[in-house]
From Swiss-Prot:
UniProt superkingdom: Eukaryota
Keyword Repeat: yes
Protein name: Zinc finger protein 843
C2H2-type zinc finger span: 33-55, 145-167
Length: 348
């Protein structure tokens, strides 16, 4: 391959744009692409551009792999990258290429100061570094003065009586030695008889609670008997006196009627109206006759009882079978009878 003239090499070009006029590969051992900063020559312009990054940005220099660290060998001490940590001078190849002293910023003291200024680290990593004490603001202040009633703490003694409002039924703390008194009987200290207790005494905060939490609870009121056991008295009649909690007074049934009641229970269940009347008679207080019922109530009792019995029979009836043509399992309902008859006629 024909070689290019020497006048077209990168030496005649400005150092700010180190490029080569040709991108071909030279096989005669010449290195026409030279770096103006360090004087190293390369056979390709791509290698020169990659090498120029060493002089332009020191951040990319720190991220170079060990294979490409040979690009840093021809660097001079005064042309070292402006790195505050000086990591580019830690490789063995770079130390071999340096013949003089290192730059002034590579000294131990200057490196430590620059590293602490740029990226602060915890104490003990670079040595005993004294950190400035944080400013004493309201969030970091110590509040040594505590109220013996509510437990709130303040930073000044005067604020204890100015900012903290006095609690109901209690006296404010004066000078840290004045006692406080509460309306609750359980808050009185066992040692004193007047109910006064010095601030900061053991158990003063736990025992000095608001009166609402220390008052005894009211006795539990048991509810009355259920409505089903209370006598049914119309609004026109006088009120029946309350039945005591010890038990219900059951009206005494005459001995002549007891055999009849036993015979009636042995014969079978009675109607709902008669059962309800008997239960009212049993719960009825002595001395009051059974309230008279209107004629309309007697008339409504019959249809309601029949409807209730009809609903019970329908609930007890078995579900319809899967085969509607099986007449033996069909219940007595006219709708299902009609449907079965139609299906039988259709089949025949």
């Amino acid at each position: 391959m024909r070689s290019l003239p020497f006048a077209l090499t990168v030496e005649s070009v400005s150092a700010r744009a180190p490029t080569c006029c040709s991108t071909g590969r030279f096989t005669q051992g010449r290195q026409p692409c030279k770096c103006k900063a360090c004087g190293r020559g390369f056979t390709q312009s791509a290698s020169l551009l990659q090498h120029w990054r060493v002089h332009s940005d020191w951040r990319e220099t720190l991220s170079l792999s060990p294979v490409r660290q040979d690009l840093l060998w021809p660097l001079q001490p005064h042309q070292a990258p402006a790195s505050p940590l000086g990591r580019s001078h830690s490789s063995a190849g770079v130390r071999q290429g340096f013949s003089g002293q290192l730059c002034c910023w590579l000294t131990k003291e200057h490196t430590l100061a620059e590293a602490l200024r740029l990226s602060p680290v915890p104490a003990g990593f670079w040595g005993p570094v004294e950190a400035d004490r944080p400013p004493a603001n309201s969030h970091r202040r110590v509040c040594p003065f505590c109220c013996c009633s509510c437990g709130d703490s303040v930073n000044e003694k005067t604020s204890l009586s100015q900012r903290v409002l006095p609690h109901p039924g209690e006296k404010t703390c004066r000078g840290g030695s004045v006692e406080s008194v509460s309306l609750a009987p359980s808050s009185v200290a066992p040692d004193s008889t007047s109910g006064l207790r010095p601030c900061g005494s053991p158990g003063s905060f736990l025992q000095h609670l608001p009166p609402s939490t220390l008052l005894p609870r009211p006795p539990f009121l048991y509810p009355g008997p259920p409505l089903s056991l209370q006598p049914l008295v119309p609004s026109g009649l006088p009120a029946v006196p309350a039945v005591p909690l010890g038990g219900l007074e059951v009206a005494q049934v005459p001995p002549a009627t007891q055999p009849a009641a036993q015979q009636e229970g042995a014969m079978g269940p009675r109607s709902c109206a008669s059962a309800g009347r008997d239960s009212r008679e049993a719960v009825q207080a002595p001395g009051y006759p059974e309230p008279a019922r209107k004629a309309s109530q007697h008339r409504a009792a019959g249809p309601l009882g029949e409807a209730r019995a009809r609903l019970q029979r329908q609930c007890r009836a078995p579900p319809p079978p899967s085969n509607p043509h099986w007449r033996g399992a069909l219940p007595v309902f006219p709708v299902w009878k009609a449907s079965s008859r139609r299906s039988n006629l259709a089949r025949h």
